[in-house]
Amino acid sequence: MSEITQTVRFASDRQLIVTEQVKRIFLFGNTTVDGTYKNITAGLETVKMGQVMGKVAATGKWVICKSAAVDGSAIPRAVSPEEITDATAAQEVLVSLIDGGEINKAGLVFNGTDTLDTLVGGVRMEDLLIANSRSLSLKTITDTAGFGNY
């Protein structure tokens, strides 16, 4: 949740201060990538807004990023800006995903017990992304190709 405070000044110099909480994941400067999401599970699958996504190397299809995957999709490459509900087994859906920009890291959704740390492995966090307590700036995987494990 982000807290937004607005100050409105009236002609008589009195102030009205409005504070509201807004669920905001995507903050600014976001870039998108279009592609196809494919449900590779045996049953229904829901991709939530903020879901961390990976890309299958052989097919180029987007799937939920899972640290145990061996098909290339264990690398976090993008974030879903919307919910994809009840995708049936093997269903393919055209998607537009966020692959760069600033997002609220509290809004990220991971698979199972995965965390950002389990997905990026030994790569130093400050090399992979610029983070602070409220948000992080995603970089595409090509931007991090020169970084080694520490």
Placement of each model-derived feature along the sequence:
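Surface-exposed, low-hydrophobicity beta-strand/loop segments enriched in small/polar/acidic residues
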Residues: 1-150
